[in-house]
Design a protein with these regions (language model features):
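Beta-strand scaffold of nucleotide-dependent catalytic cores
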Residues: 89-92, 116-117
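Stable alpha-helical structural segments in soluble proteins, enriched in small hydrophobic residues
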Residues: 162, 166-170, 198-207
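C-terminal capping/lid region of NAD(P)-dependent oxidoreductase domains
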Residues: 11, 203-220
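Short, hydrophobic secondary-structure boundary micro-motifs
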Residues: 47-48, 185-187, 211-215
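C-terminal glycine/acidic-rich active-site capping loop/insertion
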Residues: 38, 52, 59-73, 77, ...
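Predominantly a Rossmann-like dinucleotide-binding segment in NAD(P)-dependent oxidoreductases
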Residues: 1-70, 124, 208
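Glycine-rich phosphate/pyrophosphate-binding beta-alpha loops
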Residues: 91-100
């Protein structure tokens, strides 16, 4: 994200550890951890993180004549280990000048790869290692009326959904679960698990070492 890319952007509660705890880690990386769980299907068990705050001071949002010390991270980079031994990497930034709002992932496997970028929300890039070598390369798979809730917003293919529709789908699923008195995959207990992973990342960034998520389970 780029909402802090301008060093003259006033400091609010999100930039202060006393009110926000962490910066890009808590605000942005939580989404990546949740996405990783869904896509990889394995929990993160160990992390190594490094974070950075390029702009040490910002104007006070309540008094522009004052400067406030920024004590939260503007960007963080993490190596993660999953419970099955696989490794991955994550990064979050709120000072990326060219990416106002972005979320992306890439998975590399022995049989191929998939890539996704939120700014092209209706497209999934797919690479197959089993196709004719002359035809190898990423191919675009487009969302259509046979995929999920797409047809609830679009009468035909190629129309496309956007971020606001995704939020509507989330709200619908949560409210439906409440009215039907059933559990959802993302609940308070899961939120606590994500916080445990984030705390392990924060501890790693502060102490400069690999941290097991299990070390944090009694502190979150």
């Amino acid at each position: 994200c780029s909402y802090c890319a301008d060093p003259n952007t006033p400091a609010t509660w999100r930039q202060l550890a006393a009110t926000a705890g962490t910066g890009a880690l808590g605000d942005l990386t939580a989404h990546i951890v949740s996405l990783s769980d869904m896509i990889v299907g394995k929990e993160i068990v160990e992390v190594f993180a490094s974070w950075d705050t390029p702009y040490a001071e910002r104007p006070d949002a309540r008094d522009s004549s004052r400067k406030l010390k920024i004590d939260t991270d503007d960007q963080i980079y993490v190596i993660v280990k999953y419970e099955d031994g696989r490794i991955g990497s994550m990064s979050s930034s709120r000072v990326s000048v060219a990416r106002p709002v972005s979320l992306a992932y890439e998975i590399q496997g022995s049989k191929g790869s998939v890539k996704f970028e939120m700014t092209r929300i209706n497209e999934l890039l797919y690479y197959s290692n089993g196709c004719d070598p002359k035809e190898r390369g990423y191919k675009i798979i487009k969302g259509n009326t046979r995929n999920g809730d797409y047809a609830n917003f679009c009468g035909t293919d190629e129309q496309g959904i956007a971020y606001n529709e995704i939020m509507s789908i989330q709200a619908h699923d949560i409210l439906t679960a409440i009215t039907e008195d059933r559990k959802v995959d993302i609940d308070i207990a899961y939120g606590q698990y994500v916080d445990t992973v984030l705390e392990a990342m924060a501890t790693s960034a502060r102490e400069g070492r690999w941290v097991k998520v299990s070390e944090m389970q009694e502190t979150v």
